[in-house]
């Protein structure tokens, strides 16, 4: 289990200070999967580090056959992402890192409280991050599994607690048809087909507020995991009946899936699903916002992005 757990307002802040715990040198290189939200590169750049990307299979596992070829003396760490809350082959990543004497950075931003054999995702790497913000609106967790200098932990203010909207959300969820009518009356469908529409700007660093941390402890995460896995199964049936190809053949039995994700045959078909979701009160969206150079070069990750359709497992 981690030697230290620290609560920040966002996962990217947790990653920023987690990287400092690794005590890497300027311009050291981190291996990052090519299919990832562009916000992960903010803390890498803030720490004066470089990155190289590695390719993925259709199930978003690494192309292991080519990964060894990327190792150089400047490679000091690799990022392992549990996409959409589904666990990677953790043992294989750990073995790869031991073979090449590099650090394992575990990114569980999509699956907070998910487990493997009873152990929480995010706690296997030399450092790990998780994002309860995906589930409760705020919070980024840093897990440290190595000795670190206390100086890496800065004097930061706590995030101001947000006004709770859970009561209103509960009432609206009791009358979903009314909720859907309100949403469609005051909003237009987000432009999920726009690869630049959902980028997140750099933000100030905060620790998580005391109120949010206490709320996180009170939440019954086991119930949330069960509800989301059941929703995953229901969404998978919808997707299969609609001709989509699931990224994962089944949901992991201890996971906390942020969403169900599948491949459409084309971006045109993906857009049809975005429209269908908006019309039928089902949250269907795209992910991730990629780096600008990936969009401009029409690279493999961008072509993958054009076809991926995500269905929220939030109740």
Segments predicted by a language model, with ranges:
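PLP-dependent aminotransferase class I/II
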Residues: 2, 6, 36, 79, ...
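PLP-dependent aminotransferase-like
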Residues: 2-5, 13, 20-108, 112
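Short, solvent-exposed loop/turn segments at secondary-structure junctions
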Residues: 13-14, 36-38, 59, 83-86, ...
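Conserved active-site segment immediately N-terminal to the catalytic lysine
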Residues: 106-142
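Active-site-proximal region of nucleotide-activated glycan assembly enzymes
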Residues: 129-130, 136-163, 173
């Amino acid at each position: 289990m981690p030697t230290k757990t620290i609560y920040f307002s966002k996962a990217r802040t947790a990653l920023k200070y987690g990287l400092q715990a690794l005590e890497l040198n300027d311009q050291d290189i981190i291996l990052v999967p090519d299919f990832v939200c562009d916000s992960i590169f903010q803390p890498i750049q803030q720490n004066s580090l470089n990155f190289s990307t590695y390719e993925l299979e259709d199930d978003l596992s690494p192309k292991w056959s080519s990964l060894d070829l990327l190792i150089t003396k400047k490679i000091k760490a690799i990022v392992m992402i549990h996409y959409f809350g589904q666990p990677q082959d953790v043992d294989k990543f750990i073995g790869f890192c031991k073979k090449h004497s590099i650090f394992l950075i575990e990114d569980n931003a999509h699956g907070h409280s998910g487990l493997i054999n009873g152990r929480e995702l995010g706690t296997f790497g030399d450092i790990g991050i998780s994002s309860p913000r995906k589930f409760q609106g705020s919070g980024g967790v840093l897990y440290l599994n190595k000795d670190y200098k206390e100086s890496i932990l800065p004097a930061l203010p706590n995030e101001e607690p947000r006004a709770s909207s859970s009561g209103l959300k509960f009432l609206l969820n009791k009358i979903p048809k009314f909720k859907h009518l309100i949403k469609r009356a005051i909003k237009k469908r987000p432009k999920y087909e726009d690869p630049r529409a959902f980028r997140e700007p750099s933000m100030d660093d905060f620790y998580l507020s005391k109120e949010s941390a206490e709320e996180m402890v009170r939440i019954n995460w086991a119930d949330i995991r069960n509800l989301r896995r059941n929703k995953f199964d229901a969404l998978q049936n919808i997707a299969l009946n609609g001709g989509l190809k699931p990224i994962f053949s089944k949901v992991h039995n201890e996971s906390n899936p942020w969403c169900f994700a599948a491949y459409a045959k084309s971006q045109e078909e993906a857009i049809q699903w975005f429209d269908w979701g908006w019309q039928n009160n089902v949250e269907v969206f795209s992910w991730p916002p990629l780096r600008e150079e990936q969009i401009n070069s029409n690279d493999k990750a961008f072509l993958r992005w054009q076809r991926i359709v995500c269905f929220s497992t939030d109740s």
